[in-house]
Amino acid sequence: YNCDFLASGHTVIDSDILQYYSEHVSDPIEKRGIGGDIWIWKYPNYTKDYCVLADPARGDGEDYSGLQIMDVESLEQVAEFKGKVDTQTFGRMCVALATEYNNALLVIDNKNIGWSTVQVALDSGYKNLYYSYKNDPYMDENIHIRKNYDMVNKENMVPGLTTTTRTRPVYISKLEMYFREKSPVIHSKRLLNELYIFMWTDGKAQAQRGYSDDLVMSWAMGLYIRDTALRMRQVGIEIMKRTLTNVHKSVYKVQPKGSEQWQMGIGKNGEIESLRWLL
């Protein structure tokens, strides 16, 4: 697994951690597509939630498109694609795999040629496509929650994930943090090979010249999305639950005749108020 790069000491992920992962990669249980470029390690479990992360490329020259499918809860890599395909074909592949994996959240990097792949997903009517906020320098779920951003109303959003010079370092930070904790469950030797040549160069994390980092960046996108968009969605659900819980029914309790018939219970602690002033 490109062990000759270990001595450089400039890999984004620590060499000891890469060595740990090199001992845990495994062959896929199925290879699909022309050339067998779609690798499957786990078939969909319909009790789980998945996220499909797509990094499109032109499909010619040295550019590869990369795709990862992540089990959102366990951070396990369940499927992967790396290959040279046109953006339309890649878009159809993204939608098909996302649909197969329980209508997974489909996250497509929309920079440059990525819009063509996003358009395929839009034209297909896929319902669980990820949207980014317009004019957002970076995504901070805490800021968005405080601003009460609406995750359903798409008027202020654009389809796909917008990667910028400000968000890319955040992706890398998530990648470093999770791998340092050895939290992701990685099966792919292709991804591991890319991690071995994913280096710090002049302060920027990128593949060594002549190599690609499509799989690394799509995985980093997934970790970022897991901690932002998916957290925002869950927080929104929790806020709704709390709101519904705090809506108390007003129940009129009939009092017996006699001395207590002009009393009314108030509050939640059994307090009693006399209504005799109404007489």
Residue ranges and their predicted role:
Residues 1-134, 141, 165, 169-173, ...:
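RNase H-like, metal-dependent nuclease domains and their acidic two-metal-ion catalytic environment used
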Residues 159-160, 167:
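Accessory nucleic-acid engagement/destabilization modules that flank
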Residues 141-159:
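Surface-exposed intrinsically disordered loops and tails
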